[in-house]
């Protein structure tokens, strides 16, 4: 199999960990007879330093043309980095949000597994750690607070910040389906987490999921 992987090393420890990940991929490709080519791309602070923006149209187009994207970390120290002197819409993390939206990466999959050898290092109660766990945590990435309208303004002499939380039924339905599809390959159990006793968005979320 021939594959082209877009590589976004990013900022901070990103280049270091991505370099090691590429070594692993190269060995996997060697063992299984694959050929991997890499396209180096800039995003986040690294892109700001070169192009003045956290994500360029060229980088997004190259990511879309890739078979996969390997990414490190984005951003730096908010107290010391000059990137955080910029307007919020031009800071490193906005590049990540734009990439998620551009690639329609709506489902963030985060496996959590407690291996037998690491039970002693687990911060959970002993009776829980002894049973172990194997979870797949899924988070919606392209709707909700991160993509709603936001503002900070002075109202009646008081500085007030607003973040708008919006979900539509299609956004909820597609991530619910992804969750059920993954569950069918595991233990066939799904837990949907919401705040339906307070939030309209959560009430819609629960209705669609059920």
Where are each of the predicted segments found?
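General small-molecule cofactor/ligand-binding pocket signal
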Residues: 37-41, 110, 191
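Generic secondary-structure signature for well-ordered alpha-helical cores
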Residues: 26-34, 65-68, 101-108, 114, ...
């Amino acid at each position: 199999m021939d594959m082209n992987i877009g590589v976004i090393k990013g900022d901070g420890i990103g280049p270091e960990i991505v370099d090691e990940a590429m070594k692993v991929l190269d060995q996997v490709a060697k063992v299984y007879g694959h050929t991997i080519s890499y396209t180096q791309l800039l995003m986040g602070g690294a892109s700001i330093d070169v192009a003045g923006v956290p994500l360029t149209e060229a980088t997004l187009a190259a990511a879309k043309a890739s078979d996969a994207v390997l990414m490190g970390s984005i951003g730096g120290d908010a107290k010391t980095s000059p990137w955080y002197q910029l307007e919020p819409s031009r800071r490193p993390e906005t590049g990540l949000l734009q990439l998620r939206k551009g690639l329609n990466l709506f489902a963030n999959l985060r496996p959590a597994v407690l291996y037998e050898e690491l039970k002693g290092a687990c911060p959970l109660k002993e009776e829980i750690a002894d049973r172990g766990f194997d979870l797949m945590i899924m988070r919606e990435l392209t709707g909700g607070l991160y993509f709603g309208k936001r503002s900070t303004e002075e109202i009646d002499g008081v500085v007030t910040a607003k973040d708008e939380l919006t979900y539509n039924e299609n956004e909820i339905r597609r991530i619910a389906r992804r969750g059920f599809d993954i569950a069918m390959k595991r233990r066939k159990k799904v837990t949907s987490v919401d705040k339906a006793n307070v939030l309209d968005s959560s009430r819609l979320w629960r209705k669609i999921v059920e």
